[in-house]
């Protein structure tokens, strides 16, 4: 079998940040890297899960809600994938920065945390998600589209 594109990225050189992973037709996949792979400890699942709920809810309620395809964690627990269509890289970056700021200061009930709404509703960590978001917001605060290339 051929090696898939995501396995051709030099993970030993990746730093925290936000990168354009691939473009397929009109869909852009962003790599929101919160950890240096194989260097830093990976994220905890509860924090990942809560950040996923809050980020997805935020972006799907933004002015770009019709341009959001997907947001979710990487299996390696070193980041997230964010898929969009029909928006610029600058808008995707700003939306990500805004979502992270929203999560870092979030108070209240996390959307979708019940047995009816979520497949693993017991595995959530709001404080952990807030810390992850604040840390990544700090990384991205001066990030530009020029920084988004692997």
Question: Residue spans of the language-model regions?
Answer:
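Non-catalytic beta-strand/loop surface segments
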Residues: 1-29, 60-73, 77-81, 143-146
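Active/ligand-binding-proximal structured segments within catalytic/core domains
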Residues: 27-60, 70-71
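Short, intrinsically disordered, mixed-charge
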Residues: 53-64, 98-101, 105
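M16 family metallopeptidases and their MPP-like homologs
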Residues: 68-101
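Sequence termini and other peripheral, non-core segments
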Residues: 148-150
């Amino acid at each position: 079998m051929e090696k898939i594109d995501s396995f051709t990225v030099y993970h030993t050189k990746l730093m925290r940040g936000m990168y354009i992973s691939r473009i397929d037709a009109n869909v852009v996949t962003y790599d929101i890297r919160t950890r240096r792979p194989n260097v830093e400890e990976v994220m905890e699942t509860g924090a990942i899960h809560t950040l996923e709920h809050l980020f997805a809810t935020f972006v799907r309620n933004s002015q770009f809600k019709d341009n959001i395809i997907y947001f979710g964690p990487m299996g390696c627990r070193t980041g997230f994938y964010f898929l969009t269509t029909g928006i610029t890289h600058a808008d995707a970056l700003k939306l990500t920065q805004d979502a992270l700021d929203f999560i870092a200061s979030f108070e209240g009930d996390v959307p979708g945390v019940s047995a009816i709404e979520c497949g693993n509703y017991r595995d959530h960590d709001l404080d952990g998600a807030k810390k992850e978001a604040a840390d990544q917001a700090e990384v991205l605060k001066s990030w530009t589209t020029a920084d988004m290339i692997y």
